[in-house]
């Protein structure tokens, strides 16, 4: 639906300002730092795909493209948030709670995921709220990223 505004071949960059706020919030909530923090958290670009059942079919093509893109995860909803944030020049970011690894033969089934969600949802909510509080305290000019500007737009305000 957004292909005219943002073709599928256009990468949507991760915004460092948002990632730093999320990483700070994760460190505060989990009380981890250094390698221990990096062990549980990855930051970067999240890719998407237009086929919800891609992992159930032959997927060597999508896997190769995703690997070459250096994406750290695949998520349809995060892509929608990023695409619209990018399109409307609104800072964007998502905090994903990874509960399945389809490429490793670990599909998320309803019963298998319930324990994971019980333990993770509350901490992710605290992390999200704290990240928004960190961002709220930042001056607007710091939150606004140059990555939200296109090639034809002036690089500086």
Language-model segments: residues:
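Accessory terminal and edge-of-domain segments that mediate assembly/interaction
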Residues: 1-157
């Amino acid at each position: 639906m957004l292909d005219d505004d943002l073709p599928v071949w256009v990468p949507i960059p991760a915004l460092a300002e948002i990632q730093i706020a999320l990483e700070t919030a994760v460190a505060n909530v989990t009380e981890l730092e250094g390698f221990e923090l990096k062990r549980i958290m990855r930051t970067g670009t999240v890719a998407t795909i237009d086929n919800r059942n891609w992992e159930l079919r032959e997927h060597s093509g999508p896997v190769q493209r995703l690997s070459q893109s250096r994406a750290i995860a695949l998520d349809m909803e995060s892509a929608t948030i990023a695409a619209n944030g990018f399109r409307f020049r609104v800072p964007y970011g998502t905090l994903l709670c990874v509960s399945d690894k389809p490429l490793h033969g670990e599909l998320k089934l309803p019963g298998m995921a319930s324990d994971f969600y019980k333990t993770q949802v509350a901490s992710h909510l605290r992390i999200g709220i704290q990240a928004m509080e960190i961002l709220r305290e930042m001056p607007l000019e710091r939150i606004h990223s140059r990555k939200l500007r296109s090639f034809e737009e002036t690089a500086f305000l």
